[in-house]
């Protein structure tokens, strides 16, 4: 039982580290809408530091 709990905690910690890695954040980080043009063909908005793109469909 302790082994399962330890493995679960390690998985959660590993996921948190990967999510907060600088490279992952750098990919869509923005201050203004124009910062998103290198990530999106059609920029929807920059909100809370994240780029949102318009997708055809």
Curated annotation (Swiss-Prot):
It is found in: Secreted. One of its GO terms (cellular component) is extracellular region. Keywords: Disulfide bond, Ion channel impairing toxin, Neurotoxin, Potassium channel impairing toxin, Secreted, Signal, Toxin. Disulfide bonds join 30-46, 36-51, 40-53. Residues 1-26 form the signal peptide. Expressed by the venom gland. GO terms for molecular function: potassium channel regulator activity; toxin activity. Inhibits voltage-gated potassium channels. Belongs to the short scorpion toxin superfamily. Potassium channel inhibitor family. Alpha-KTx 17 subfamily. Has the structural arrangement of an alpha-helix connected to antiparallel beta-sheets by disulfide bonds (CS-alpha/beta). This is Potassium channel toxin alpha-KTx 17.2. It comes from Lychas mucronatus (Chinese swimming scorpion). The lineage of its organism: Eukaryota, Metazoa, Ecdysozoa, Arthropoda, Chelicerata.
């Amino acid at each position: 039982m302790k082994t399962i709990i330890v493995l679960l905690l390690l998985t959660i910690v590993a996921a948190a580290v990967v999510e907060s890695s600088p490279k992952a954040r750098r990919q869509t980080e923005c201050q203004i809408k124009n910062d998103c043009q290198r990530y999106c063909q059609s920029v929807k908005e920059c909100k809370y530091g994240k780029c949102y793109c318009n997708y055809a469909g």
